[in-house]
């Protein structure tokens, strides 16, 4: 199931659509790093600036896969 959530990053509200396992993983990563979900997504958003055509939801999925791969 795909879940759409609104997150505020850089004082701007944006929507992210992810499958449930990705939301669970994203929350686990934020919790383990002791930061908010919005802070983590903001970090991911800053990293994707090198690939501007990459959507934020895709960037989040790639971040999660790379996080667990390492």
Report each predicted region and the residues it spans:
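C-terminal structural segments of small proteins and small subunits
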Residues: 51-70
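Short Lys/Arg-rich basic patches
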Residues: 1-17
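Alpha-helix N-cap and coil->helix boundary residues
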Residues: 36-39, 55
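Amphipathic alpha-helical interface segments used for dimerization/assembly
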Residues: 30, 41, 64-68
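Surface-exposed, Lys/Arg-rich phosphate-binding patches that contact polyanionic backbones
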Residues: 21-33, 43-50
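Short amphipathic alpha-helix starts
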Residues: 14-23, 35-37
